[in-house]
A protein has these predicted regions:
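Cytosolic juxtamembrane N-terminal segment immediately preceding the first transmembrane helix
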Residues: 1-55
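Extracellular/periplasmic helix-loop-helix junction of adjacent transmembrane segments
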Residues: 56-91, 300
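C-terminal ends and interior cores of transmembrane alpha-helices
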Residues: 115-128, 338-354
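Glycine-rich segments within core transmembrane alpha-helices of 12-TM secondary carriers
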Residues: 144, 161-189, 205-206, 399-411
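Central cavity-lining transmembrane alpha-helices of secondary-active solute carriers
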Residues: 79-99, 307-320
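Conserved MFS/SLC helix-loop-helix module at the cytosolic interface between two early adjacent transmembrane helices
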Residues: 92-128, 327-330
Length: 479
């Protein structure tokens, strides 16, 4: 035991010297400029990896299920949705993977994540069957959920410029997805069977950016400062702190959080609102099928729509941020949910009635920006601001679970319906899930959920929105 402690101390002493040297190294005055350029390109790769398979859903199902297996499109899409559930257990590994960056640093995982996103894109480019495709797609899905480029942006910016820098890079990344329709026009030439080639260019960008990050990005000062402080802390003191943290965390836990949430008005209605809201989540993943099979848009028309998709997405993402800062969380969720509802209705009707692909594209982009603007606010902010400190982490997990459960439920419903309804009706089916979900969320947020902006998170108890209990006891004398 003593030898193990000595080895640990010796290893940490070497690491401490290395970390202090890294922290003391001076950066040139242009470092942040080229770092943010690298991060923006990595973010573009991340955004493309997040959305490209959604945008090529029709092509993927047609090749792997309709042509290779001889299935009808609806049955093929249903099976494709079922196969997607296989990746769920792998995604759960993020719980163990993500904390590694707190021990080994941000830079190694910025490089690894970017490299693996590029590798996933490249595997899909090479895929000839659904099995190879799923390997590449699952690898992409796992890595995009880590968002190490976001951590870099936040930790390399000061408090005054943090929000601005993040907003700028995020907007650039969304607009960078214009690369996909550009590649559809040039390399793919709007030929459905050539969809694989579109994956090649962002894969190459991912590989190059991983190399650039390895050569030119430095470890963040925020991590180095925290790690050095940890290494300088005696082992016994660390053990005592860990014990105290475990005792504090023992007050939490998902079951305790669920029981607490259902006992208190604010969290109870936030959960109900989320159940409705996430029922509409399939609208974010099925617009390719709606355009190709329900609206019967050609590859050229879909490409034109996708040129306007990032514009609508970026515009409504910025609007969401402005509304949140100006008017608060509740108004943001209601306003952006209304916007998402209007945009999705416009998307479906614009496509089905052949108005113009440009309007169809900006409408679905507006839906995506509005929907996730509301979703990030309700899940990422309001759950946290409505929970006491000792349960906050556990309560936010409820939102993640609701997203998976309701999204999975909606997927199962469509898996049953897709093989038996005409392709022309797919758009109306997704509309039938999206509209009631958003309307329900809007009504519940408007009537039953309180505002949380401006609350001191250190003093929130979660009971602030509970109605005072009425004393119904009566004396024998009457009133």
């Amino acid at each position: 035991m003593a030898k193990n402690v000595e080895r640990l101390q010796a290893r940490e002493a070497k690491e401490l010297i290395r970390r202090e040297k890294q922290l003391g190294a001076r950066s040139n005055k242009f470092y942040l400029i080229y770092l943010f350029m690298i991060l923006a390109l990595i973010y573009i790769t991340d955004e493309i990896a997040s959305t490209i398979s959604i945008q090529f859903q029709t092509n993927i199902v047609t090749e792997f299920f309709v042509k290779n297996m001889g299935m009808e499109y609806g049955a093929g899409l249903s099976l494709f949705s079922a196969i997607g559930f296989i990746s769920y257990p792998i995604t759960l590994l993020i719980v163990f993977y993500r904390p590694l960056a707190d021990k080994f640093g941000r830079k190694p995982f910025l490089v690894i994540n970017t490299l693996c996103m590029g590798l996933g894109l490249f595997i899909v480019y090479l895929s000839k069957d659904i099995y190879t495709y799923m390997i590449g797609s699952t690898l992409m899905g796992f890595m995009v959920s880590h968002d190490m480029q976001c951590v870099y942006i936040l930790e390399c910016s000061n408090e005054k410029t943090r929000a601005r820098n993040y907003a700028i890079v995020k907007a650039v990344a969304i607009l960078g997805t214009l690369l996909v329709p550009l590649l559809r026009t040039t390399l793919m030439q709007n030929v459905s069977e050539r969809w694989h080639v579109v994956y090649l260019v962002p894969a190459i960008i991912g590989f190059v950016m991983a190399l650039f990050a390895l050569l030119f990005a430095k470890e963040t000062n925020a991590f180095l400062t925290k790690r050095i402080e940890y290494l300088k802390t005696p082992i016994k003191e660390r053990e005592q702190r860990s014990k105290e943290e475990r005792e504090q965390n023992a007050q939490g836990g998902i079951l305790t959080a669920v029981k607490f949430a259902f006992k208190h008005r604010q969290l109870r209605f936030l959960i109900i609102a989320c159940c409705c809201f996430y029922l509409a989540s399939l609208g974010t993943a099925t617009y390719s099928t709606v355009m190709a099979k329900s609206a019967l848009m050609t590859e050229e028309e879909i490409t034109l729509a996708l040129f306007l998709y990032p514009v609508g997405n970026a515009l409504f993402t910025l609007i969401s941020g402005f509304v949140s800062d100006k008017f608060g969380r509740k108004i943001t969720i209601i306003a952006m949910s209304c916007s998402a509802l209007a945009c999705y209705l416009l998307f479906v009707f614009s496509g089905m009635f052949k108005w113009t692909p440009y309007l169809t594209g900006i409408a679905i982009g507006g839906f995506m920006g509005s929907y996730w603007g509301a979703g990030d606010t309700i899940g990422g902010i309001m759950f946290s601001e409505s929970s006491p400190t000792n349960l906050r982490s556990s309560v936010t997990v409820i939102n993640t679970l609701l997203n998976g459960i309701m999204g999975g439920l909606a997927t199962i419903i469509t898996m049953i319906l897709l093989p038996i309804i005409p392709e022309k009706m797919f758009g109306y089916m997704y509309l039938g899930l999206t509209v009631p979900g958003l309307v329900g969320a809007i009504i519940i947020m408007w009537l039953f959920v309180g505002e949380t902006r401006g609350l001191d998170l250190k003093t929130v108890t979660g009971t602030e929105w509970d109605k005072p209990k009425k004393n119904k006891e009566k004396t024998q004398d009457g009133k």
